Each structure stands twice: as structure tokens, then as C-alpha cells.
Amino acid sequence: MKKTLLDKLYIPNSCKVSRKLFKKQFIENFSLNTSEKAIISEDIDNITLEYLLNKDKINITPFSDEENDYTEIAFIRVELLSTKRLKKLSNIIQYIPYPLILVFADENKICINISPKRINKNDSSKLVVEDSYFTEWIDLDNSNQIEHEFLESLEIKNHPFTNFFEFYSSYLNKLIAFNASQYSGSLEQNEDTRELLRKIQEVESSINDIISKIKKESDIRDKVNLNIELKKLNDKLENLKTRLQG
């Protein structure tokens, strides 16, 4: 059998589960709306709980405080029929009530999602997603040098066994460094990397909005003003990229 990316992380066999999760489990166990049920039914080929890490299976200490509950971590592989609603699908799978590392597979391409969670202040038995981070799609048969280095960095030996919070955060930091590398050209990061990447993505979104408005605008004066605004945003973007490069 061909090894998947998760197999290549060299997680101990004691953590291996390889248990298929059925679509009906999501429909029956979570309060999904009609749209979410359609996404589960139409977009997933297979979903498998590949590895489950807890203190009984691996020498990593659980971590919990008033805001966090990292007592176990699951690695889940999702084979897709469609990638069009990926982020919505990820949101549904993240209803599973513990920290997850999701690997979406579309034939030979993969996308990784990591979504740190905190304890719901209104119901301490529940976790809510703080933010959700995705890699771009990586072609495993045609990966470039940085993609290859990133995938190697995901091997379990490259992450701290201090506790599950530090362990999970390390995976998140690797993902953020990879996303930043498309601007910096390197997997190196510093304490400002996450914030700079967030600002870059915000500016890029604003640039796309302005470009769309320019295409639709018929008034010459308004179009000129929009182009001036676009120039300022592009300058800001270049400045942020330079800062990210260190």
C-alpha cells in the first residue's frame, strides 16, 4: 500500500488508529444545516482518523488551563470528491471536539488545515475554533524545494514533546512559516511572521476588491481615485513583503 503523507510523519504505531469515519456520524452527531449536510454528502470520498495522540499512547504531557484543552490530538485524512467548498467542509470536520490536524487529499495533491481551538466561555465542555489556517495545494509528485522541506519539517521528531499545546503550536508555526515562504522565499520565521502574513493577506484581499471595482467603474474621476488607492495598497504590500523577508 502506498504511504500517505501522515505515514511519513513517523508517528509511533501506538498512536495509529486508521478508523474510517462515516458521513452519517457527522450528520447524526452535529446540528448541521441543509447546506452543511450537502457538503458532507457530496464533497467527501473517504474520511479516516489515522492517528490519535494522548498520554496513554505517546510520551507527551496533556495541557489545559482556563482557555485551552490540549489533552489529545487527532490527525485526520480526508479524500475529496470536490475541493470547491473546502473551507466550509473543514469547518464542519472541526466540530470534532478536540484539536485536529487535517490533511485533505485530491488525488496526488494535499492541503493541510490547522485550527487552534479554545474553551467556550459559555460552555466549558465545548471547544471553539479561534482561527483556521490552510496551506496552498501541494502536488506530492511535483513538489518544489521549499514544499519538500516543509513536508519534511512535519515529521514528528521536529516537534517538542513538552506538552500537547506546544506540540500542536509547533505544527501551526511550521504551516505559517510555509505560507509566509511564498513571499519570503524561506521557511525561516520570527515573532512577527504571523502578524505580517495576516496583514499581507488583508492587503491582497483589498487589492482584489479594488481591481474588481475598477473593472466595473465607468466614471473616469472615480476610476482615477480607485487607481490611486490601488497604488497605495500595492506599495503597502511590497513594504510588508520586504519586512517579512527580514
Predicted stretch roles:
Residues 1-120:
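N-terminal, leucine/charged-rich tether regions that mediate assembly and partner docking
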